[in-house]
């Protein structure tokens, strides 16, 4: 039978949109499933699984509602947001539940445990959600509509996740029975406990080895960064084995590709496109472009006129060429008067007859080669033909050129976004801690994982392109959350232990370490699910973000406390307190005891209606 091959950018976009809709549903199910499984393995309690999932389900509905309210479409990027919200929102629940269980284990008072949970974790959770949102909201500084929509919807709903979490989780827990003994067993999880003890010993006894190992890893990563290169393909998101990609290869092999490139020639005067001299010039340009590799035969009014002349002489190949003076008037009259021809000609000549379009197709050879082909081959050929005539102006355009220039522009935009995220988060740290040393200490463990990931990209030949450059600001905004949680607890312990740094660090590792481990594991597996995507960019986003967050978990659990041990004296000016120390939940002794007996309604209370016995 006849084998059909489909291609063209409209067809490619349609197929990709259908796949995006399918993956939206797939990733929501996968993200909910994987987080539910991990929560159950950690907490061994259905309550600790169901409560977070209720919260996250509410926010997922909000995400889809936000997309609709803003009149956005579900794209390759916005389709990922529900799954990303699931993965990022669950750590809120982990920190809140862990604190609730820790407090309840101390005194067995549910109301007091809920109160302390909100007071001690609430503000820190807001700050961490805010820094995570910053990693997405900085994408608004780009001039790419797709990224702006992605950043805005994600940023808004990450902040909404905090609101829903801090309202619903304590509210639901207040109606549920107090935790039973088996629900608190995870606090004594021996494997996690031993691992945290090991980290504590490493920080206290071998911190300089931690620095040495970090320096070696960083050096190796920097060498990898030097091997990093930037290149993108117009359809590199499409899987290699898909029928769509095979059809694209067929068109590249047989028709030099499907990526459109247009040459616009303005002759400066109306009706000058049919001038014999101008037609010869365009013919000269087309003959120069014809033999180029990865470029299709040019199509314009010139190539059409040559084909009509051949048809006029009964298809004789000898007559394939521009009309001669003897047959020129007849052929041009035929071209102008036939309705089908007129419709065709309007695609290549404007209504004034002053501007002509020459259309080419280019193979998807990568942004670098495309840029070189356009700037160093095609444009010089155009200049060679038309440079002597000042009346004539030319321009190269089309989606291929937009892709090449847009890719370069986008990479620069994303670099600026990362820098902006870095600066904004540094300012937040400055407001919280009001100490330059603490700002530097908090940022180093989160900057090193970015360099490590960039190094891996260099060693494995993973190019820097929009889908991979995107991960750095996102991962940085997420990874800094662990630093904030650790430093917040560290500040609290400094007050409680009279500013004795070693004990403050040990207690901080013991109390926040398990939550940091749990949330990092959830984030790692939550982003890993994107490797099941059919889009190469989504796979890269998931894999590289997972790696970055995995590295950040270790740097925040080892390098951060080691830096504090060496560079933080623990001394504080008694008359000056940074913003983070102004909140009562940082001082253990200020916890107000809640007498649950006072919450009971007295039988003879005059303000309460009588009840029948």
Predicted regions and their residues:
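Generic non-transmembrane alpha-helical segments
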Residues: 1-2, 254, 284-294, 373-392, ...
């Amino acid at each position: 039978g006849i084998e059909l091959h489909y291609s063209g950018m409209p067809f490619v976009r349609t197929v990709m949109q259908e796949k995006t809709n399918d993956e939206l549903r797939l990733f929501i199910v996968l993200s909910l499933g994987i987080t539910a499984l991990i929560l159950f393995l950690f907490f061994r309690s259905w309550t600790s699984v169901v409560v977070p999932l209720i919260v996250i389900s509410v926010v997922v509905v909000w995400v889809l509602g936000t997309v609709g309210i803003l009149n956005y479409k579900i794209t390759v990027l916005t389709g990922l947001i529900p799954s990303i919200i699931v993965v990022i929102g669950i750590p809120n629940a982990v920190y809140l539940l862990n604190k609730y269980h820790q407090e309840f284990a101390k005194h067995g008072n549910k109301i007091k445990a809920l109160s302390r949970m909100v007071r001690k974790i609430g503000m820190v959770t807001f700050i961490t959600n805010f820094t995570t949102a910053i990693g997405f909201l900085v994408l608004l500084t780009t001039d790419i509509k797709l990224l702006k929509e992605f950043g805005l919807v994600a940023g808004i709903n990450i902040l909404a996740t905090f609101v829903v979490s801090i309202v619903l989780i304590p509210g639901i827990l207040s109606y549920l029975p107090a935790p039973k003994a088996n629900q608190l067993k995870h606090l004594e999880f021996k494997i996690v406990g031993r691992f945290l003890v090991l980290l504590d010993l490493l920080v206290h006894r071998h911190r300089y080895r931690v620095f040495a190992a970090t320096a070696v890893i960083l050096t190796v990563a920097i060498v990898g960064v030097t091997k990093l290169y930037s290149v993108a393909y117009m359809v590199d998101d499409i899987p290699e084995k898909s029928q769509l990609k095979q059809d694209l290869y067929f068109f590249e092999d047989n028709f030099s590709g499907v990526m459109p490139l247009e040459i616009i020639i303005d002759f400066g005067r109306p009706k000058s496109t049919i001038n014999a001299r101008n037609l010869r010039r365009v013919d000269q340009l087309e003959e120069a472009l014809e033999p180029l590799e990865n470029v299709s035969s040019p199509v314009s009014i010139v190539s059409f006129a040559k084909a009509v002349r051949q048809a006029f002489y009964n298809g004789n190949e000898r007559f394939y060429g521009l009309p001669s003076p003897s047959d020129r008037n007849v052929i041009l009259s035929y071209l102008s008067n036939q309705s089908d021809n007129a419709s065709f000609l309007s695609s290549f000549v404007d209504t004034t007859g002053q501007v002509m379009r020459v259309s080419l197709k280019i193979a998807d050879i990568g942004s670098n080669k495309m840029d070189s082909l356009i700037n160093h081959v095609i444009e010089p050929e155009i200049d060679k033909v038309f440079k002597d005539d000042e009346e004539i102006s030319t321009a190269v355009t089309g989606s291929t050129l937009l892709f090449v220039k847009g890719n370069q522009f986008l990479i620069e935009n994303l670099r600026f976004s990362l820098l902006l995220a870095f600066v904004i988060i540094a300012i937040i740290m400055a407001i919280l801690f009001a100490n330059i040393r603490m700002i530097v200490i908090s940022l180093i463990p989160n900057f090193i994982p970015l360099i490590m990931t960039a190094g891996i990209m260099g060693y494995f030949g993973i190019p820097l392109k929009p889908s991979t450059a995107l991960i750095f600001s996102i991962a940085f905004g997420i990874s800094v959350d662990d630093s904030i949680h650790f430093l917040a607890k560290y500040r609290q312990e400094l007050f409680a232990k009279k500013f004795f740094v070693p004990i403050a660090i040990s207690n901080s590792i013991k109390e926040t370490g398990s939550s940091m481990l749990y949330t990092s594991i959830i984030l790692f597996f939550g982003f890993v699910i994107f490797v099941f995507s059919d889009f190469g960019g989504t796979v890269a986003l998931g894999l590289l973000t997972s790696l970055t967050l995995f590295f950040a978990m270790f740097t925040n659990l080892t390098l951060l406390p080691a830096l504090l041990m060496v560079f933080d004296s623990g001394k504080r000016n008694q008359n000056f307190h940074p913003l983070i120390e102004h909140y009562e939940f940082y001082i253990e002794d200020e916890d107000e005891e809640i007498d649950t007996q006072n919450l009971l309604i007295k039988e003879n209370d005059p303000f309460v209606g009588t009840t029948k016995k």
